[in-house]
Amino acid sequence: MKLSKLEKALKKVRVTPQRDDTYTIGNVLWAIRMCRLMGLDCCIDEATAAEVAILIGRFQSLDLQDSPLKGKDEKAILTTLKVLWSLLAGHHPENSDMAEKYWEAWTIRERESQKEEEGEITSIYPQLRKNFPAVSTSDGSPRYDPDLTKQLKIWADATEKHGVDHHAVNILGVITANLTQSEIRLLLQSTPQWRLDIQLIESKLNAREHAHRVWKESHPEAPKTDEIIGKGLTAAEQATLTTQECRDTYRQWVLEAALEVAQGKHDRPGPINIHQGPKEPYPEFVNKLVTALEGMAAPETTKQYLLDHLSVDHANEDCRAVLLPLGPSAPMERKLEACRAVGSSKQKMQFLAEAFAAINVKGDGEVQRCYGCGKPGHIRRDCKNQKCFKCGKPGHLQRNCKSKNREALLCPFWAEERIPSGEDFCDPVCSPVGIRLNRQPFIKIFLGGRWVRALIDTGADEVVLKDIHWDRIKGVPAASVVQVGVTGRNIARRKSNVEWRFKNRYGIVDVLFSNTPVNLLGRSVLQSIVTKFTLAAHTKQIQPLPVKLHGPGPRVPQWPLTLEKYKALKEIVEELLKDGKISRTPWDNPFNTPVFVIKKKGGSKWRMLMDFRALNKVTNKGQEFQIGLPYPPGIQQCEHITAIDIKDAYFTIPLDENFRQYTAFSVVPVNREGPLERYHWNVLPQGWVCSPAIYQTTTQEIIAEIKDRFPDIVLYQYMDDLLIGSDRPDHKRVVSEIREELGAYGFKTPEEKIQEEQVQWLGYELTPKRWRFQPRQIKIKKVVTVNELQQMIGNCVWVQPEVKIPLSPLSDLLKGKTDLKDKIKLTEEAIQCLETVNKRLKDPEWKERIKEGTELVVKIQLIPEGVVYDLLQDGNPIWGGVKGWDYNHANKIKKMLSIMKKLSRIVMIMTGREVSFLIPGDSEDWESALQRINTLTEIPEVKFYKHACRWTSVCGPVIERYPTYYTDGGKKGSKAAAAYWREGKIRREVFPGTNQQAELKAVLMALQDGPAKMNIITDSRYAFEGMREEPETWGREGLWKEIGEELRRKEYVGVSWVPGHKGIGGNTEVDQEVQKALQGPITVSLPQEILLEAGETKLVKTGIFWEGLRPCKLRPEEGLKLKGSLIDEELQLEITNTQNSRVGIRQGQTIGTCFIEAIPQAIEEHEKWHTTAEILAREFQLPRRVAREIVHRCQACKRTVSCPRRGTNPRERFLWQMDNTHLEGKIIWVAVETNSGLIEARVIPEESAQSIVFCILMLVYRYTVYHIHSDNGPCFIAQKVEALCKYLKITKTTGIPYNPQAQAIVERTHRDIKDKIAAFREDCETVEAALSLTLVALNKKRGGIGGHTPYEIYLESEYNKYQEQQNHYNNFKTEKWAYVRDKRKVWKGPYKVLWDGEGAAVVEENAMPTLYPHRHMRFIPPPNTDTQDGNL
């Protein structure tokens, strides 16, 4: 802000609210001057609010206890600065108090922002800890341990000079006497300057740990390895839970390892004792180091680690200065190239001469310059201003330099360098994770016209460079200053107004020059180029995958929640918002998805869920990459295994920014306390259909990188569970690096979820060599819900490889159950099945994993429900299960081949190898059965074991010379009948059962009565296929079991099938016998006692009202001379006494039998089409009472109640009413012909004019349409529909708006269609199929006017139209003549008829057309050509 504007703004601010005095520019200048007196620099010209805020903070941090400014002046200065800050920040305070409030509000916001940033870093990097000696208390919080601090100090003093030597080992034995395992590890890690010694100690400890794990397998009574090393336990738990023996063992391991390291360093020459001499060439030093490492007994990884670090740390001072910027992990070729010019003076000068040969080479037009001063006319060795290339000071050369500081000057002092651009800077300092602390934080900055590489030093106030840079840096020399540091007092030269540049930032700074070992970049520059320093690790960015919708986004409103659930949801949302997983959505986002919370199992915590069904419907779904769980036997054997769990896996992967708006949800307060709080997801939400596929795609790339980096490890991934196996001795290091790689992408792998050696993974327990199912128990309750029973069955199916029992007792209980809350009582068989499962899961057996080169065999055992199989390796089962029969195949061998094919596929997936089978029976029987199958494509390798199993069948094709039995069965009501027929021999049997049972009973009867060799012919496909499969006793139960036993006694049975009711001899006879058995006579008795005189006739009730039977004929009992017939309407029996004497009939006395006629056919017709009573009575000649009773007893027709018939409409031929209705989410177009009631309907995709146009075209080419009447719906009054009707010359009218009676006929039809669809819906898969059956029922099976169906009435209309057209055509085509009678009743003619209409005709009389009625005309055939007009 300019001074003029600032002065005007200050005049509007009062000093206090009570006074009218205002601030002036002089007050501000006084405050700035006072700050400068205290050493605080500030310039009022072009000052910003941020600079003033920094000035206020620095002023408040001053100690003014003994200063003359203490008191009123201090408060006046602070108040004036705060007023200045508020004006520069854009506020308009009226007085100083308001400026104070603005300042307090801003500081509070800054403090909260800083806390949020610190919380974010802590949540992303929870493993960050301060390096201090602390132990964990019982509640998990750290506290300082003063005793451990003393021991750390003793250990540091012991290893300060020579590292881990014999003296340090003795000290270590004393101070670790009472320490736990974690405290000993903390002690070792507290000496970072001797990290090579510690690395060797840890390598030897890992070797001892591995050896103990191997030894522990054969000595189970010994302590566990994890207990000895204290793995998975806190310091407090190690002190209380682990035994003293375990702690002493670990301490002994540490002392032995430390002693070996000390002996290797000091007893014999080793790599640790090799150092580069001051003038020794670097390649010679590296060769000696490699030779020493080759003779060292250590793993290759340890040797490589030592080579990388010793080649830098043990190099001389000159080489180390060059190698430190490269880092220890740089390739050895790069290190050798960098140190090529380091060594003797001759080598250094030769390198410089080669590097800058182009400067001293004289070319065309070029002037030779001195490399030292840059002046032309002489070279460097003749230069009078000699300067040292080592320290930069004049007066001596490099070979005579006594300074220990060295700066590599590869550019002449006088050379100009261009001003850099943003692309020249490669150090990402401005980002919070830009500076890596695994090496010294150097950056390259353009300072005073030169590139300078400086070390970031937050403890330095100013920029401090080496003295060598004094002549190179452009600036104004200023007075020297006194530096006070860790080395004491030092006088440094100073240059002011030095320009610096870094990326897109620049400024002016003072630079100090002193005898410093390294260039330092202090806070004077850092505060401008670095915003903050955070302890953050380097992370790799995950690119979100794009997602698209194929429809509109979800707009489902949020339903209300209880107060308890609202509070829980609010708490979860705040936590997610704090972690950055969700964000507040903009006000213009119209999409919404409902959200709710449920309680987690076994606790009071809540879990947030979202109903993504609407969003999932319109999301373009991808293909999930995870196709199933890995089989544990197929996991490769390893020496070490580790299981890792990824925490919040979905929440680590970002969601596509363009898609985030569709995941918006709302938090609605109770009683509408305030407005909605709207959020959307920034990461993958749970429950969204694409979250698994995106997660799998992302992690697949990361896992591929890890496998490429470690090709010798075994890595299994299932969603967020990882299993790592390897044979490496440094397995833990590999696991640590994999976790670091995952952490680089933001995936968290908590320590508490890491398992080693014996792990629980995906429901299994795994060791390096074996596996088993985790022990578990299924809770058994006598009464369960459908949902609970489904969960039980799912758990049992999961452990089938262990239990290997059929689950049919449990699955049979679910038949017919649709509601998940229905109660089911477990049967004894089901409870016994669950108890068997629990017994086998109490302590599952350990099984081996698949070994390379071993033979795999699948052994199959037969059970009634299917087969039990075991995958054998060296005779021991490693996998198994139960497979049920596939009844789609024709015989048993096809079923077995199908199961073997499935098992081969399972083993192929598990191992990638072929497998052989061990099945029951013998090879001859098996090969004989295979020869009968003509469609075999693949036969697996098979071996056999002894078992009573026959693969061939006695059933085959019919042989004519054997006797043939025709069988049939049927059912009526609850009664079933079975019969067989053979050359007039008949056997019938009636029993309660089903139709299939009747068919099987007939076959069983024929087998029982037939010879050893016979034929059976049936019209039942069920019985025919079952006979071909040969139902043995082990395969089926019930009638099939009895049939199988009978088949064992036969030598040969020919089986064939014929279609029923086709007049085939034998089948027709047996069918008639079954019908007779089902239609047997029904006895008739009277419900009350009657007395009949001789010749008397009475009407009595028969007592037969239902079962679909119509008594048609009455046969009296012997001794009764009665005559009877049925009265249709009343179902009464008219009985006449034909005897000469009185006859008395007691109550309940049987008077005769009635026989069935036509009723079964009527019932079958109604069950198919739900025909009306009028049509049944007409087609089957039934009494209307019986027909109505048939309809009344139909449950589907009971549910369909017709709507009341209100409203009338005009009815005429070929007038169609149209409308749309909705059912089950479908749109049904309906058209009804008003004269006949004929209905046409179809399902259309949408209510649009285009769909109505297609429907009208379909109606026109099927029926005659003169007139269309509809409502005022947009799709019916559209321009397309009107134009089509006009083109087809169809009259188009609409009804009265908002008056349903204008469409009364079609509205009634809507209800009729829905009722009929409801009746047919159970038998149809789709609405379209049910609609087709409905049209048949309503058009052809429903009585209308005069008892005719709508279809018949419409056909009559079409016939009448045809007759009219024919008459009209004949009137013009056929030549007619007629005699006519005039008014005088005189007949004249004949005249030619010009036109013949209805009731009258026009004749040509005397060359004039004359009209006569038909009653005055007599038509005659055309006369001959010579006929003349005349009078009769």
UniProtKB/Swiss-Prot annotation:
Residues 452-525 form the Peptidase A2 domain. The active site is at D457. Residues 1206-1358 form the Integrase catalytic domain. Mg(2+) 2 binds at D968, E999, D1019, D1071. GO terms for biological process: DNA integration; DNA recombination; establishment of integrated proviral latency; proteolysis; symbiont entry into host cell; viral genome integration into host DNA; viral translational frameshifting. GO terms for cellular component: viral nucleocapsid. Keywords: Aspartyl protease, Capsid protein, Coiled coil, DNA integration, DNA recombination, DNA-binding, DNA-directed DNA polymerase, Endonuclease, Hydrolase, Magnesium, Metal-binding, Multifunctional enzyme, Nuclease, Nucleotidyltransferase, Protease, Repeat, RNA-binding, RNA-directed DNA polymerase, Transferase, Viral genome integration, Viral matrix protein, Viral nucleoprotein, Viral release from host cell, Virion, Virion maturation, Virus entry into host cell, Zinc, Zinc-finger. The record marks Y125, P126, F351, L352, P432, V433, G522, R523, I1151, G1152 as: Cleavage. Pfam families: Gag_p24_C (PF19317), IN_DBD_C (PF00552), Integrase_Zn (PF02022), RNase_H (PF00075), rve (PF00665), RVP (PF00077), RVT_1 (PF00078), RVT_thumb (PF06817). Mg(2+) 1 binds at D645, D720, D721. SUPFAM superfamilies: Acid proteases, DNA-binding domain of retroviral integrase, DNA/RNA polymerases, N-terminal Zn binding domain of HIV integrase, Retrovirus capsid dimerization domain-like, Retrovirus capsid protein, N-terminal core domain, Retrovirus zinc finger-like domains, Ribonuclease H-like. Zn(2+) binds at H1166, H1170, C1194, C1197. A zinc finger (Integrase-type) spans 1157-1198. Residues 815-843 form a coiled coil. Residues 579-766 form the Reverse transcriptase domain. One of its GO terms (molecular function) is aspartic-type endopeptidase activity. Specific enzymatic cleavages by the viral protease yield mature proteins. The protease is released by autocatalytic cleavage. The polyprotein is cleaved during and after budding, this process is termed maturation. A zinc finger (CCHC-type) spans 368-385, 386-403. Its EC number is 3.4.23.-, 2.7.7.49, 2.7.7.7, 3.1.26.13. PANTHER family: ENDOGENOUS RETROVIRUS GROUP K MEMBER POL PROTEIN, RNA-DIRECTED DNA POLYMERASE-RELATED. Matrix protein p16 forms the outer shell of the core of the virus, lining the inner surface of the viral membrane. Capsid protein p26 forms the conical core of the virus that encapsulates the genomic RNA-nucleocapsid complex. Gag proteins are synthesized on both gag and gag-pol polyproteins. Gag polyprotein (AC Q82850) is produced from conventional translation of the gag ORF. Gag-Pol polyprotein is generated by a -1 ribosomal frameshift occurring at the gag-pol genes boundary. This strategy of translation probably allows the virus to modulate the quantity of each viral protein. The reverse transcriptase is an error-prone enzyme that lacks a proof-reading function. High mutations rate is a direct consequence of this characteristic. RT also displays frequent template switching leading to high recombination rate. Recombination mostly occurs between homologous regions of the two copackaged RNA genomes. If these two RNA molecules derive from different viral strains, reverse transcription will give rise to highly recombinated proviral DNAs. This is Gag-Pol polyprotein. The lineage of its organism: Viruses, Riboviria, Pararnavirae, Artverviricota, Revtraviricetes. The gene is gag-pol.
